[in-house]
Curated annotation (Swiss-Prot):
Subcellular location: Mitochondrion outer membrane
UniProt KW keywords: Coiled coil, Membrane, Mitochondrion, Mitochondrion outer membrane, Repeat, WD repeat
Described purpose of this protein according to its UniProt entry: Involved in mitochondrial fission. Acts as an adapter protein required to form mitochondrial fission complexes. Formation of these complexes is required to promote constriction and fission of the mitochondrial compartment at a late step in mitochondrial division.
SMART domains documented for this protein: WD40
Family: Belongs to the WD repeat MDV1/CAF4 family.
Keyword Nucleotide-binding: no
Gene name of the record: MDV1
Any coiled-coil regions, as ranges: 270-303
Name of the protein this chain belongs to: Mitochondrial division protein 1
Upper lineage: Eukaryota, Fungi, Dikarya, Basidiomycota, Ustilaginomycotina
Membrane-spanning segments: none
The organism's place on the tree of life at top rank: Eukaryota
Name of one Pfam family that matches: WD40
Annotated Low complexity bias: 365-383
Length: 814
């Protein structure tokens, strides 16, 4: 291919010109481009006879340039037709020259390469310009491919220095392209030239030339051969053509060896002499040098093409990875939907079983109809903490934005210590350090009344349907009927106002001391004017209206956790014991001593920490002199009695700082209890999670993993999930007996609840933490939320309640 200064400068040219809106502007632009081309080519006029004012066929310079760009277009027949049409239209010679391109159908300045290819193809198909020697050559294809930059270069008014710089830059770019590992782009024609099989023929030709020059192939009978291939084939056991299979004598074999050796020596000596004498001609060496440089360029082009293909493959891989990630996300969404449907199926199945059971009983159809009319609330069996399936909620709940607190209950004057509710938009009971237990109507957000009777703080409570059980720092457990709270509050208000009127009428009543609360169940007296007083006839009134229906005593210290289901209640207290109660009789039927379980581990309890995913280490086995130590004692060691002596005293543990920097002494030795059937799980201040058999009262397994007191736990058919002051939530697989996952936070965990899809936790921050068990993603409920760390929470389906140190209770839509 011939190299012209125009094409050399064009490799340095700038961006292609933008499209023009009208034919007038197109003609002006092309005219200016042709004039610029004249000025650009004038310095090179003496150097080439093809760049004069008159060129081939008598055309002037612009016509010659256009003929080079579109040889199939600028033929004699086409030019004559254009000239005749211009004459008929009365165009000037300059206009005629511009019209030669602009009047051609399908030509566009914005995409000249495409236009020229289309016009050339149409001309070939029509037979115009076709001859025995005519056709589209590689040079013409290259020009067509580079026409965008040719026109852009011609449209610029460049001076001689700029032209020289452009030419030098183009040559530098060509030289740099040979050394670069990859080019940003390779033309189609150049890539074809570099990859055709004939591009490697020069290498074989040069080998033959060197062989001839060195004497290997200059024999009178053709190329001289050493028989290397025959020896190689024979060594591999192949049949060698032309070799006599008859055995030869030792003398003949020796003579053949001598002959071959002499022949090889002569050939090698001639080869060495030939390489030293450089018998190859100068023209041949220059040709070989050009071939090598071209092949080096071809290697660079092929490398660029391979790099481009690899980059394209990488892009496709990224796209496929994005598609895979999207499909994986959809798969996780389907998994969540499947789990939700499983829970719904189980819940509906339970309701159906209850309905069938009611219908099978005497008077069953009426009872089933009443249960169905009540919305299914009375048909639920078991604790609501294990209840699955959809809940009955108003349709307005779907209109609430998820993750936003839409209700605030703010009558408490101290941090919330415990809370629970019956169902969404039902009844909520909350306890606080202000030593009050308040009952709320979640449909209106108003306080219904209070549960009066405990002296001190209520530390734990549970609500099921219309029954509430509370445990407090006064060592007692009380059972409440929530249906009586509102009427009892009204009676207290009426009694208090009536006694006040009586005092105003009687001076003796005004001199009486202020009433105080009596701890006995035989009478209820006025405390700060809140409750009624009386004995005798008042006893009957108390039995009828008092919401406290029973009081259970047995623990010697604060009751810190409880769980009840049906007629069975289990409580845990700071006296390091667990007690099982019969709610029908109010009697304690079983006492389980945690200290005894620590000091007397059974054979089934003696489970190594490595079995649960924790490696055995001296630091974990070393006994500690205090529960405040950083290491946990070996519960199966005989040396742990010193630790038990410390545990037998008053228990306290400093909590890690919360998000607001506050901390306190944690004194609840039993952080959480839950049972199902005869299986009981408890979390205690020594960091252990124990599994108890309620038939024998023995702890048959201890799950070790937490390094601080366990504050909360919950379990289902397959997992126990526990939270601790060590800032972690641990998920225990009951089937494998090991930790399946650990979720860590920056602050202590004080409360949690989970289902098959998510875990909600209070982790010492202002927001409620949400962990998706399917996607393993973390979230937080903060919008319109608490202003101090959250400490208690409870949720059902898409309805959650939380209480914090800011003394308020927040209601959330999940």
């Amino acid at each position: 291919m011939s190299y012209s200064p125009l094409l050399g400068a064009d490799r340095r040219a700038g961006e292609p010109s933008s499209g023009l809106a009208s034919s007038t502007s197109i003609r002006d632009t092309l005219s200016g481009a042709l004039n610029s081309t004249k000025a650009y080519l004038q310095p090179f006029t003496p150097a080439s006879p093809y760049l004069g004012s008159n060129g081939v066929n008598g055309h002037n310079e612009p016509s010659r340039l256009l003929s080079d760009v579109a040889p199939q277009l600028m033929t004699t027949r086409m030019m004559a037709a254009v000239t005749n049409s211009n004459t008929a239209l009365g165009l000037t010679p300059d206009g005629q020259r511009r019209a030669r391109l602009l009047l051609t159908p399908g030509f566009s300045i914005t995409s000249p390469a495409r236009s020229l290819v289309r016009i050339g193809g149409s001309l070939i198909q029509s037979g115009i310009g076709r001859g025995p020697m005519n056709g589209i050559t590689s040079n013409e294809l290259f020009v067509l491919e580079e026409s965008d930059r040719i026109l852009a270069t011609a449209a610029r008014d460049l001076d001689l220095e700029a032209n020289a710089d452009a030419q030098l830059g183009a040559r530098s770019a060509i030289e740099a392209s040979k050394s670069k590992a990859a080019e940003p782009s390779v033309s189609l024609l150049r890539g074809f030239q570099a990859t055709i099989p004939s591009s490697t023929e020069g290498r074989q030709r040069r080998r033959r030339v060197r062989a001839l020059a060195s004497g290997f192939e200059d024999g009178p009978e053709g190329p001289t051969k050493l028989g290397l291939k025959a020896m190689g084939d024979k060594a591999r056991g192949l049949m060698v053509e032309g070799v006599d299979a008859e055995p030869v004598s030792a003398f003949q074999a020796r003579e053949q060896r001598h002959a071959r050796r002499n022949q090889a020596s002569r050939i090698l000596s001639r080869a060495k002499e030939g390489s030293r004498s450089s018998a190859i001609q100068l023209e041949e060496l220059e040709r070989q040098l050009r071939e090598i440089e071209r092949e080096q360029g071809d290697v660079g082009v092929r490398r660029s093409l391979i790099d481009s293909e690899m980059a394209a493959v990488d892009d496709k891989i990224k796209v496929l990875e994005n598609i895979k990630a999207g499909l994986h996300k959809k798969l996780l969404g389907l998994r969540e939907e499947e789990l939700e449907l499983n829970d719904e199926h189980e819940g509906v199945g339970e309701l159906l079983a209850v309905q069938k059971h009611l219908r099978a009983m005497p008077g069953g159809p009426a009872a089933a109809a009443n249960a169905a009319a009540s919305g299914g609330a009375t048909t639920s069996q078991g604790s609501s903490r294990r209840r699955k399936g959809p809940l009955f909620m108003p349709s307005e709940h779907d209109e609430l934005p998820s993750g936003v607190a839409f209700m605030t209950l703010a009558d408490h004057s101290a941090p919330i210590t415990s809370l629970d509710f019956t169902e969404p938009y039902g009844t909520l009971v909350s306890a606080s350090l202000d030593e009050t237990v308040r009952v709320w109507d979640l449909a209106s957000g108003e306080e219904v009344g209070r549960l009066r009777g405990h002296v001190g703080t209520v530390k734990c409570l549970q609500v099921e349907d219309e029954v509430c059980i509370t445990g407090g720092s006064d060592h007692s457990i009380r059972i409440w009927d929530l249906t009586k709270v509102e009427n009892f509050e009204a009676r207290l208000t009426m009694t208090a106002s009536g006694e006040l009127r009586a005092r105003r009428r009687s001076p003796d009543l005004n001199r009486s001391p202020p009433p105080v609360a009596d701890e006995s169940m035989d009478s209820i007296k006025i405390r700060d004017g809140d409750t009624t007083a009386g004995d005798g006839d008042e006893e009957e009134v108390r039995d009828e209206f008092d919401p406290c229906v029973k009081r259970l005593e047995g623990h010697s210290k604060s009751v810190t956790s409880l769980y009840f289901d049906d007629n069975c209640l289990v409580t845990g207290a700071s006296d390091k014991t667990l007690r099982q109660w019969d709610l029908n009789t109010g009697q304690c039927v079983l006492t389980m001593d945690i200290l005894w379980a620590i000091s007397n581990p059974t054979s089934s309890q003696a489970i190594s920490q490595s079995e649960f995913g924790f490696p055995e280490s001296p630091s974990r086995k070393a006994s500690s002199s205090s529960i405040l130590g950083a290491t946990r004692p070996d519960l199966s060691s005989r040396d742990s009695f010193s630790v038990l002596n410390n545990l037998s005293g008053a228990f306290s543990y400093p909590t890690p700082p919360y998000a607001d920097g506050s901390w306190e002494m944690y004194q609840d030795f039993v952080g959480g209890v839950q049972f199902w059937g005869y299986a009981l799980a408890s979390g205690s201040g020594d960091g252990g999670v124990r599994m108890w058999d309620m038939r024998t009262g023995q702890a048959h397994r201890t799950l070790l993993g937490h390094t601080a007191p366990v504050t909360c736990l919950q379990f289902d058919e397959h997992h126990i999930i526990s939270g601790s002051l060590d800032k972690s939530i641990r998920i225990w697989d009951l089937r494998m007996g090991s930790i399946s996952d650990t979720v860590r936070y920056e602050h202590p965990v004080t409360a949690l609840q989970f289902d098959s899809r998510k875990i909600l936790a209070a982790t010492g921050e202002n927001g409620v933490k949400l962990f998706n068990r399917t996607t393993l993603q973390h979230g937080s409920l903060t919008l319109n939320g608490h202003t101090s760390p959250v400490e208690r929470l409870r949720y059902m389906d898409r309805y959650a309640v939380s209480g914090g140190k800011d003394c308020v209770v927040k209601i959330w839509a999940l």
